[in-house]
């Protein structure tokens, strides 16, 4: 928890959300405070916060809660303070209480958004009308509807409509032409384009709707839109679970202009032009440090998952506050697509442009070089799955491996596994001791391996288990008389 409101402002600045002069943060919880961050052009405030003011039993004040900008959410982190062990325990308990409250509120918002999505989707028309976004992107309106001059894109989890994305004809002052229905739980939500059945053998996955339309047009194959790079992995996980034998091709965005984006950022925000470069040797490619006035800069470029990123920090003072802003600029499209492909045994392809261009995705390729060029680059016959190639198990191991695939489910983002026979959680290290390193490493590398989010482990004594969840209830204990 933050010990002062200045700590909260510095945490905001560290992720690029700058509180403007004249706006004082204040405890607003349970209501939200809002402001237009420095650099925003549109009039509607896009930055928000909800700050709780609390006191320890000794009377010391600390602040908890969350903040963000548009759909981005950050929890207020603990800051250094001379807390006693008792106070640290109190603060930890309060943090747990607020996390549980936050999760419940998010679920309530998601439920309301899902109901609203059904209502608006039923009101939206299917009649194709002229729309500047469609014309600008050279696409047909696959799978969408129209409502008040907006394209309405459905967002599903399995077969349930959980939200909507709205696309406007023109970008606003801040370059934004899309928004999600407020409260939508976007993680794992997708939009299908084309017919997908249990017999589907080939399916493409993309980030954005326009890219999805272009890929569907070029390949005449079903496409799934994940809406953003960070959502590729959870969406592909769902597809792989539903279609374990299908060939999945991730047609990724190549956000390749990281170095020029970093140079522009430093010039616009600090009026400095640091030397930033990259070569092809090694993971850490380039390191640069300099001090300009009261600005201290340390920045380096590094290569990860086949993409170059710019990292480091900038230290400076603003309105009497000492700011240490983290720099973390990556080729999110390439990085996230590569990770998802490796995790789930998918093929991976990025657009290649023949001329100097600002294009980054397959829609840009269609607009600039034509549908035929995109079709050629997207040919699935030329693509092989990423990740370690699994050798077929020997006959003596086959039964063991199939049993492990059926019995265990990996908990996403952890080293913990759900054992469906014992009805308990177990660490992967313990599994290796039980079944051997060879068998468990094979299981981890097999795209058929089951995986689930922790929140989808549910306790349902009545047996009414929500779709996509695992029931951890294994019956009431029987106590003899």
Tell me the role of every PLM-derived stretch.
Residues 1-132, 255-257, 262-267:
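Non-catalytic accessory segments of DNA primases and related replication-initiation nucleases
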Residues 131-148:
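Short, basic/aromatic recognition patches
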Residues 22-28, 145-146, 347-358:
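Acidic carboxylate-rich catalytic motifs and surrounding loops in phosphoryl-/glycosyl-chemistry enzymes
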Residues 109-112, 150-244, 262, 271:
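Phosphate-handling DNA/RNA-contact segment within nucleic-acid enzymes
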Residues 130, 211-212, 235, 361, ...:
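Short, hydrophobic/aromatic alpha-helical segments in well-folded domains
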Residues 1-6, 201, 217-402:
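TOPRIM fold recognition
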Residues 2-3, 15, 384-481:
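N-terminal nucleic-acid engagement/recognition segments and initiation subdomains in replication
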